[in-house]
Amino acid sequence: MPAIVLIGAQWGDEGKGKATDLLGGRVQWVVRYQGGNNAGHTVVLPTGENFALHLIPSGVLTPGVTNVIGNGVVVDPGVLLDELKGLEDRGVDTSRLLISADAHLLLPYHVAIDKVTERYMGNKKIGTTGRGIGPCYQDKIARIGIRVADVLDREVLTHKIEAALELKNQILVKIYNRKALDPHQVVECLLEQAEGFRHRIADTRLLLNTALEAGETVLLEGSQGTLLDVDHGTYPYVTSSNPTAGGAAVGSGIGPTRITAVLGILKAYTTRVGSGPFPTELFDENGEYLSKTGGEFGVTTGRRRRCGWFDAVIARYATRVNGITDFFLTKLDVLSSLETVPVCVGYRIDGARVNEMPMTQSDLHRAEPIYEELPGWWEDISAAREFDDLPAKARDYVLRLEELAGAHVSCIGVGPGREQAIVRRDILAARP
C-alpha cells in the first residue's frame, strides 16, 4: 500500500491538520517528518472540540492510528510532555505515539541562543518563533546534536551535553553577556523528562517500512509550507528544515519510491507569518476582512498572519518542486460575500511580465502582482458537501485555481469542522 505525503503549498498555515484529520480514519500510520514546535495544526472534531497540536501528529485524534515523530523532527521534551498531558486530560488515547530514536532533542541552550540572536539582530532578524528550532538543526548539521536515543545512556548523554555546552556557554557569556548553563542541571532535567517518553522510543524506520510491506497505508505529514523550505523557500526567510515532499523520505526513513501521491494543501487566499517577501499582501480593508473572517492568528505564536490574495505563481512553483498530484483547497468559505476575488496570475518585475517564480529573492521583493478578477459569490457555502452544492461562481473559482496551479483540486474545505469538506476525488482510492 502507498505512502502519501501531505505538504503545505504556500507559507504554512494552510490547514494541513484538517486534511490529515479527514484522511486519518483510512490510514494506519501518520508520521511527522520535519520541524518542531514552531508550527501548529488545528483540528476541530464533529463534537466542536478544538485541538491545537504542535509536535504530535494530527492522527493522534483518530482511534487506531499509530503516530510517529520521525527522525527529521526536533523534539523539545518539555513541550512534548505538556502536549501529551493536555491530550490525555481531555480523554485522548496517546498510547500509539512513537518517537524515532534518531530524532534530535531541543534543549534549553537552543532556546536561549535563538532568543538572544534574534534580539541581537534587531531590524535584520529573520522573525523566528524563538523556540530554538534553528539552533537545534545547526547542532544536527554540525554533528554535535543530542538524539532521542541518547537519553537511554546516562554516560553518553552527559558526555555529549558537556561537549556541546563548552561552546554554547562561550557564545552565551562572551558574545551575548548571558549566564552560562550548568551541564549537570541540563542532564538531570532531561533524564527526568525522559521518564515520560522513553517507552515511546523506537526504530521507526524499520516499523514504517515493515508496515508498508504488510500493505498498510502511511500518511507523511509536513509542517509549515513549501515557501518556508530551507532549500526551495524564500531564503533567508525560511525555516531550518525541508517541509517539501523530498523531506518526507529523508525525515521518515521511507524510500522515495514508496511514495505514490503528494497532497498539497492550498488556502483559497494566501497568508504568511514573519518577515519576507509577499507579493499579494494586502494592507487595506480586504486584508482586514481576510484576517478577521479567516481567524488568521498563528496556532503556535499567536501572531497575526499577513494576508493577501491567492498567488498562482507560488502554487505552480509548489506543484513543481513537490510533484503534487492533488490539492486540498481550504477556507473557500472565507471568500463568501466578496463582490470580486482577485487572483495573482503573474508578476511584473521592472516592467517585464514574469509567469514563474523569480530566480532571485531581490526580484521577488520587487515583484508586483498581475491580477485576474474573478466574480465573487454571496451564498453561505459551509453546508456544501458535494461540488455541485457550491454556487456556480464558487465552482468557477475552484476550477480556475486548479487550472493555474497545475494539479487536480480533489478536496475543498468549507469550514473548520472535520465534516465541512467536499471530496471531488478520493485521494486513497485513486492511488495504485
UniProtKB/Swiss-Prot annotation:
CDD domains: AdSS (cd03108). Its cofactor is Mg(2+). Substrate binds at residues 299-305. Keywords: Cytoplasm, GTP-binding, Ligase, Magnesium, Metal-binding, Nucleotide-binding, Purine biosynthesis. The active site is at residues 13, 41. Binds 1 Mg(2+) ion per subunit. GO terms for cellular component: cytoplasm. Pathway: Purine metabolism; AMP biosynthesis via de novo pathway; AMP from IMP: step 1/2. Mg(2+) binds at residues 13, 40. Its EC number is 6.3.4.4. It catalyses: IMP + L-aspartate + GTP = N(6)-(1,2-dicarboxyethyl)-AMP + GDP + phosphate + 2 H(+). It is found in: Cytoplasm. The keyword 4Fe-4S does not apply. IMP binds at residues 13-16, 38-41, 129, 143, 224, 239, 303. Disulfide bonds: none annotated. One of its GO terms (molecular function) is magnesium ion binding. PANTHER family: ADENYLOSUCCINATE SYNTHETASE (PTHR11846:SF0). Belongs to the adenylosuccinate synthetase family. Plays an important role in the de novo pathway of purine nucleotide biosynthesis. Catalyzes the first committed step in the biosynthesis of AMP from IMP. This is Adenylosuccinate synthetase. It comes from Mycolicibacterium paratuberculosis (strain ATCC BAA-968 / K-10) (Mycobacterium paratuberculosis).
